[in-house]
Amino acid sequence: MGKHVQLVMGPAGSGKSTYCDTMRKYCEEIKRSVHIVNLDPAAEVFEYPVSVDIKNLVTVDEVMDELHYGPNGGLVYAMEYLIENMDWLTDELGDYEDDYLIIDCPGQIELYSHIPVMRILVDHLQQIGYSVCSVFLVDSQFILDNCKFISGALMCLSAMVRLEVPHINVLTKIDVLKTSDQYKEIEKFLDLEVQNLVEELNLETHDRYHRMNKAIGSLLEDFSLVGFVPLDITDQESLNVLLQHIDNSIQYGEDLEPKEPPLENDDDDDDDEGDEIIRMMNGNL
């Protein structure tokens, strides 16, 4: 079936680790073997079993102690160190034919928008035979109004344009909002018309921003980036719909051979139908 990757991204607090663990458990339930890769050199506690861990190569604490960097500088250095040692990652991933990886990435947005670390990582994964889908998580509680939605959408756009791979935007923590009145606010963003968004933004902002609102709306519409897949981790159907979106984007399972029905059963069914017809004909004679 080939080798496939979910590259799980999103700002801190968007639920990346919870997503990875939930998706792993769901895949196990549907008999799909997955491996989780931790690429956050600052991660301390895992909610899931880790198959490959960047901290076996480098940690942020080590960088901060040895080079006296701050947390963000230490993270960037650690990720650049990974890029310089891609052979380590290749060896850790192995060379299996049917790999399905879920890669838990750091949350610092500069890794996707300012420096080429994640793009180099994606290119390397593709070179060694992986089909990659970027899964960008946004906390649904973060986009409860139009301005916040624009901010979240532009953040997704930055990662999508930078990486140039199939891209799925996910609204997380829907299960939290379902029990509150705020869920109605989220629903309008799930099937949003850009023109309506621009009109509402114009009502909320000064006249001098109206041209900018229109330009941003056109940008999002041109890139078809107003679509988010809602995720309720307590709902199996929600997980199934999201996984189907991801699978379609990386063509997972398309090379599977269709199963043919057993011939013996078909023959038996045909014989039964023939006997019944003969009995009916005899009864009418």
UniProtKB/Swiss-Prot annotation:
<feature type="region of interest" description="Disordered">
    <location>
        <begin position="253"/>
        <end position="276"/>
    </location>
</feature>
<dbReference type="InterPro" id="IPR004130">
    <property type="entry name" value="Gpn"/>
</dbReference>
<feature type="short sequence motif" description="Gly-Pro-Asn (GPN)-loop; involved in dimer interface">
    <location>
        <begin position="70"/>
        <end position="72"/>
    </location>
</feature>
<feature type="binding site">
    <location>
        <begin position="172"/>
        <end position="175"/>
    </location>
    <ligand>
        <name>GTP</name>
    </ligand>
</feature>
<keyword id="KW-0547">Nucleotide-binding</keyword>
<comment type="similarity">
    <text>Belongs to the GPN-loop GTPase family.</text>
</comment>
<dbReference type="InterPro" id="IPR027417">
    <property type="entry name" value="P-loop_NTPase"/>
</dbReference>
<comment type="subunit">
    <text>Heterodimer with gpn1. Binds to RNA polymerase II (RNAPII).</text>
</comment>
<protein>
    <recommendedName>
        <fullName>GPN-loop GTPase 3</fullName>
    </recommendedName>
</protein>
<feature type="binding site">
    <location>
        <begin position="13"/>
        <end position="18"/>
    </location>
    <ligand>
        <name>GTP</name>
    </ligand>
</feature>
<feature type="site" description="Stabilizes the phosphate intermediate; shared with dimeric partner">
    <location>
        <position position="72"/>
    </location>
</feature>
<keyword id="KW-0378">Hydrolase</keyword>
<feature type="compositionally biased region" description="Acidic residues">
    <location>
        <begin position="263"/>
        <end position="275"/>
    </location>
</feature>
<dbReference type="InterPro" id="IPR030228">
    <property type="entry name" value="Gpn3"/>
</dbReference>
<dbReference type="Pfam" id="PF03029">
    <property type="entry name" value="ATP_bind_1"/>
</dbReference>
<comment type="function">
    <text>Small GTPase required for proper localization of RNA polymerase II (RNAPII). May act at an RNAP assembly step prior to nuclear import.</text>
</comment>
<keyword id="KW-0342">GTP-binding</keyword>
<dbReference type="GO" id="GO:0003924">
    <property type="term" value="F:GTPase activity"/>
</dbReference>
<dbReference type="GO" id="GO:0005525">
    <property type="term" value="F:GTP binding"/>
</dbReference>
